[in-house]
UniProtKB/Swiss-Prot annotation:
Encoding gene per record: dnaK
InterPro entries tied to this protein: ATPase_NBD (IPR043129), Chaperone_DnaK (IPR012725), Heat_shock_70_CS (IPR018181), HSP70_C_sf (IPR029048), HSP70_peptide-bd_sf (IPR029047), Hsp_70_fam (IPR013126)
Transmembrane segments: none
Superkingdom of source: Bacteria
Record-listed Phosphothreonine modification sites: T197
Protein's recorded name: Chaperone protein DnaK
A Pfam match: HSP70
Assigned protein family: Belongs to the heat shock protein 70 family.
Lineage: Bacteria, Pseudomonadati, Pseudomonadota, Alphaproteobacteria, Rhodobacterales
Keywords for this protein: ATP-binding, Chaperone, Nucleotide-binding, Phosphoprotein, Stress response
Organism: Ruegeria pomeroyi (strain ATCC 700808 / DSM 15171 / DSS-3) (Silicibacter pomeroyi)
Annotated HAMAP family: DnaK
Stimuli inducing this protein: By stress conditions e.g. heat shock.
Length: 637
């Protein structure tokens, strides 16, 4: 069995970790960073992910997709999605099944597909470090994610070529990383304010037993909202000063978003920062306009104060559900980059009556917890038992549109619960079971997860048939429901798939697309590497010819120049393949070897006239062009 990796699939940044012996280890990506921006961009030539995608966002805002986690498992007409449409420079569209999808370069993509690209980068990062293929993962989600969002995250893993062994809640993962070595019994609160979502979870830890007592949150509250407050403020101030509205200019908005994020981060460690965006727009007379503005920490806190206060309501609800008061909490663990903001730290301290624990890295602790859970599933981590809960109540719609709960929120999972219902009319031969998730009393006010029919019920007076409805929630928090007519024994069972959601066929197609893209990405990488090799070889060989060409016969020099010219010609052609460039590389290398041999021979015959050059020649016959370059360097010295 290969290594199981732990992935924190974040709204703003993602992170991957593995178990290295008894401790989790975060793996650096190809850019040398421990976290990767959760951004995917589409250009005319290629698809970019992570830091390269972020770098080009200002010049390609419509095709740079970020914060897609806020859309995953959501309907296009959700209030939160409608709000998000106004905040992002890319287009959010109807996926055809009512789900919120995104559009880039004229193509529609599901949030699961975009997430799969990010997961693919995490997979690649782990494979590069481990030197072996990775096929299994534990992926984290916000504790307050509903069934549709969890299922869509699992789909993303499948599209990325990963078998998702477990979906684990982010605060629970953070608690695992925090409490792995803790032997004493304690109650902890995990306050997780990330880029797009907020969760609070109350847990009891006791010598390897991690028991979640309650969880609450808001899947549309995070750093993105803080950034947009700054963006709106900057745009309003600019309009007051110059009379120009930047809200319709996608490129200007993307620049403001990057500036806002940078200013927000700086104001965590300083009390004032300057935002400077030259040439952000044009005046009525064609004059360039610049945005130069000072932003103080106090002003930022006034802009986002209500957002911070908003996070306190779920904290109150979580404590109430756990049946404890703030003073019963032994330790508060902060997770997510937003918790670095001094005002957030201050409000959390005030609410719980104690300073939060500072011993964990808020950006990495979730991935580390996922790696620990991966180690538990793999059998590498012993004596750790995790008991999580379902974040939202589950039930069905009954007569009058009432939401009848079968499983209450904060029930430990996995769990199973049955209840007997009956018909509402005489001789009713079928019932429709409509499954909902939420806390409102009327079914229509909650999130519908799906529906199915139980048919061929024998004619009987209303209230007589006995229909047993059973809910089953697995350890991933994913729901399956069955309905059984106790009179006939007829049963209908489904794993809930959201009324939109991705079908198996959709997922298979996306898996295939992802594999094709991976091949295309690999081919593109090979081409870039071959081009770089070719340009480097041309440069070093031309330098060698320039410095030593007079020491060899003209036919050798001519052969080298012809090989270089042919390779340059290949490099200038559109659509040239990596194989063609490699072939040209080989020709130049072979021709250059003759130059090296001739130079070495001339030096040997010349005795010790040029000791530095002779010494640079290795004693064996494995001459590579890098040594020609060294030879040239030595000659110059």
């Amino acid at each position: 069995m290969g290594k199981v990796i732990g992935i924190d699939l974040g709204t703003t940044n993602s992170c991957v970790a593995i178990m290295d012996g008894a401790q989790p280890k975060v793996i650096e990506n190809s850019e040398g960073a421990r976290t990767t921006p959760s951004i995917v961009a589409f250009t005319d030539e290629e698809r970019l992910v992570g830091q390269p995608a972020k770098r080009q966002a200002v010049t390609n805002p419509s095709n740079t997709i970020f914060g897609v986690k806020r859309l995953i498992g959501r309907r296009v007409d959700d209030a939160e999605v409608t709000k998000d449409k106004k905040m992002v420079p890319f287009t959010i569209v109807n996926g055809g099944n009512g789900d919120a999808w995104v559009e880039a370069k004229g193509e529609k993509y599901s949030p699961s597909q975009i997430s799969a690209v990010i997961l693919g980068k995490m997979k690649e990062t782990a494979e590069s470090y481990l030197g072996e293929e990775v096929t299994q993962a534990v992926i984290t989600v916000p504790a307050y994610f509903n069934d549709a969002q969890r299922q869509a995250t699992k789909d993303a893993g499948k599209i990325a070529g990963l078998e998702v062994l477990r979906i684990i809640n982010e605060p629970t993962a953070a608690a695992l990383a925090y409490g792995l070595d803790k032997k004493n019994s304690q109650t902890i609160a995990v306050y997780d304010l990330g880029g797009g979502t907020f969760d609070v979870t109350i847990l009891e830890i006791d010598d390897g037993l991690f028991e979640v007592k309650s969880t609450n949150g808001d899947t549309f509250l995070g750093g993105e909202d803080f950034d947009m407050r700054i963006v709106n403020y900057l745009a309003d101030e600019f309009k007051k000063e110059h009379g120009v509205d930047l809200s319709g200019d996608k490129m200007a908005l993307q620049r403001l978003k990057e500036a806002a994020e940078k200013a927000k981060i700086e104001l965590s460690s300083t009390t004032q920062t300057e935002i400077n965006q030259p040439f952000i727009s044009m005046g009525a007379n064609g004059q360039p306009l610049h945005l130069v503005m000072k932003l103080t920490r106090a002003k930022l806190e006034s802009l986002v104060g209500d957002l911070i206060k908003k996070s306190m309501d779920p904290c109150k609800a979580a404590l109430k559900d756990a049946g404890i008061s703030p003073s019963d909490v032994d330790e508060v663990v902060l997770v997510g980059g937003m918790t670095r903001m001094p005002k957030v730290f201050e409000e959390v301290t005030k609410f719980f009556g104690k300073e939060p624990h500072k011993g964990v890295n808020p950006d990495e602790v979730v991935a580390m917890g996922a790696a620990i859970q991966a180690g538990v599933l793999q059998g590498d981590v012993k004596d750790v038992v995790l008991l999580d809960v379902t974040p939202l109540s589950l039930g069905i719609e009954t007569l009058g549109g009432v939401f009848t709960r079968l499983i209450d929120r904060n029930t430990t999972i996995p769990t199973k619960k049955s209840q007997v219902f009956s018909t509402a009319e005489d001789n009713q031969n079928a019932v429709t079971i409509r499954v909902f998730q939420g806390e409102r009393e009327m079914a229509a006010d909650n999130k519908i997860l799906g529906q199915f029919n139980l048919e061929d019920i024998p004619p009987a007076p209303r209230g007589m048939p006995q229909i047993e409805v059973t809910f089953d929630i697995d350890a991933n928090g994913i729901v399956s429901v069955s309905a059984k007519d106790k009179g006939t024994g007829k049963e209908h069972k489904i794993t809930i798939q959201a009324s939109g959601g991705l079908s198996d066929e959709d997922i298979e197609k996306m898996v295939k697309d992802a594999e094709e893209n991976a091949e295309a990405d690999k081919a593109r990488k090979e081409l870039v590497e071959a081009r770089n090799q070719a340009e480097s070889l041309i440069h070093s060989t031309e330098k060698s010819v320039e410095e030593h060409g007079d020491k060899v016969d003209p036919t050798t020099v001519e052969a080298i120049e012809l090989a270089i010219a042919a390779l340059k010609d290949d490099l200038d052609k559109d659509g040239v393949s990596a194989e063609k460039i490699k072939s040209g590389l080989q020709n130049v290398t072979e021709a250059a070897m003759k130059l090296g041999e001739a130079i070495y021979k001339a030096q040997s015959e010349g005795g010790d006239d040029e000791p530095a050059a002779a010494d640079a020649r290795p004693s064996d016959d494995d001459i590579v062009d890098a040594e020609f370059e060294d030879l040239g360097e030595d000659k110059r010295k």
